[in-house]
Amino acid sequence: MKLTQGCFSFLPDLTDDQIYKQVQYCLAKGWAVNIEFTDDPHPRNTYWEMWGLPMFDLQDAAGVMMELAECRRVYGDRYIRISGFDSSPGWESVRISFLVNRPPQEAEFELVRQEVGGRAIRYTTVRKAPAHVS
């Protein structure tokens, strides 16, 4: 099952040329770009490991693509995402975030329903155990 997080997650995986164009869009807007990776893509895990520092003041997406290639070389077995941070007054937040790398074996999650007191229902997202191959 394909993990869907961030922009473009409903589309086929982006090619490097498409990633380059999205990064160039971020830079044209004056956003800082950063690369992050994780082996725990749980929807509530918002704190991914950063690959280096955020890239401020870049003019060309080639620098980001070079760092992405190195991150893929080291952490190609994990999820990698690119984010564009807008520091302008009134925003000061991530404006775009999308996956640029997936591990060979995707993580799977399921929604567990639990009835609790007062006829309330509680839902929890849990990671499914990997399927065993016989």
Swiss-Prot record:
Tell me one GO biological process term.
Answer: reductive pentose-phosphate cycle
Q: Which Pfam families match?
A: RuBisCO_small
Do the record's keywords include Transcription regulation?
A: no
Q: Which Gene3D superfamilies match?
A: Ribulose bisphosphate carboxylase, small subunit (3.30.190.10)
Q: Function of this protein?
A: RuBisCO catalyzes two reactions: the carboxylation of D-ribulose 1,5-bisphosphate, the primary event in carbon dioxide fixation, as well as the oxidative fragmentation of the pentose substrate. Both reactions occur simultaneously and in competition at the same active site. Although the small subunit is not catalytic it is essential for maximal activity.
Give the note.
The basic functional RuBisCO is composed of a large chain homodimer in a 'head-to-tail' conformation. In form I RuBisCO this homodimer is arranged in a barrel-like tetramer with the small subunits forming a tetrameric 'cap' on each end of the 'barrel'.
What PANTHER family does the entry give?
A: RIBULOSE BISPHOSPHATE CARBOXYLASE SMALL CHAIN 1, CHLOROPLASTIC, RIBULOSE BISPHOSPHATE CARBOXYLASE SMALL SUBUNIT
Put simply, this protein is called Ribulose bisphosphate carboxylase small subunit
